[in-house]
């Protein structure tokens, strides 16, 4: 089968012919119909998430097939699989655990001490076929097609969890930083659907700002043309926002947007751009604000976002479908900030 693999750090991904794996036990072989392209794939190709090196610090073994946003049809099942059959159209939660560590036992498998992350340290979906280590991490699709479903397994599950952590309700105001990207447009939709909160979207390109507006943001700010803090003070009548979801965590965003928080506000940190956080500790105490990390999502988050999408309440903003051979071009688009919404590869 054809597979697009990371062979050498910092170099273009390599299109290779490799064998089709055979599922055994609880494993499932999926014929990939759609693979979303995520900014994490940029970091993987670069070989680091900030200062964390994927090989030396995170234990990734090369070569590895990238692609963690996965949807497709079941081709074959192992002898321990129940409830699924060949031909079923499924989406796959790629953030899987080995099942025995403390975090797996409390239902937070995405924090597993020995994770099985497809497209990171296990072969992913930039290929014609992919092995799912355990069938319990699949969702049988009923209304969505594969292209619509694939981005939900990362951009959807990640922002669903972040919105949950933001503790929103109709009295609250949320600021989404990076609101026009694949994650940002999902965060806006999810927050609107589940909380009724007022949503402010901020981005730095006019087309991204327009995407955030189309996703349902009540207010949008172009930070390259407006003073974002002044606009936030105007919108909130000087109170500030009750929560920020920062999908970048860059030096720029972390130097600006914590200042947008109201008292008792939450700063939910999602992005992996690699900046350091510098904030005067007494201000945290005096305003009772919180900085909260949010990493992808667990099985409950996966089920939540899939049901929300199948009910028609949220929909990934797919801006481009591309061939498997164009994986490097798709990642280049993300790295150079040329992508709005989500790109999806079709093997």
Curated annotation (Swiss-Prot):
This protein's encoding gene: adh
Protein's name according to its UniProt entry: NAD-dependent alcohol dehydrogenase
Pfam families linked: ADH_N, ADH_zinc_N
Note describing how the cofactor binds: Binds 2 Zn(2+) ions per subunit.
Obligatory cofactor(s): Zn(2+)
Substrates-to-products reaction catalysed: a primary alcohol + NAD(+) = an aldehyde + NADH + H(+); a secondary alcohol + NAD(+) = a ketone + NADH + H(+)
Enzyme Commission identifier(s): 1.1.1.1
Complex and partners: Homodimer and homotetramer.
UniProt lineage: Archaea, Thermoproteota, Thermoprotei, Sulfolobales, Sulfolobaceae
Source taxon at top rank: Archaea
Keywords: Metal-binding, Methylation, NAD, Oxidoreductase, Zinc
UniProt: Zn(2+) 2 binding residues: 98, 101, 104, 112
Stored PANTHER family: ALCOHOL DEHYDROGENASE 1-RELATED (PTHR42940), VACUOLAR PROTEIN SORTING-ASSOCIATED PROTEIN 11 (PTHR42940:SF8)
Entry's family note: Belongs to the zinc-containing alcohol dehydrogenase family.
Binding site for Zn(2+) 1: 38, 68, 154
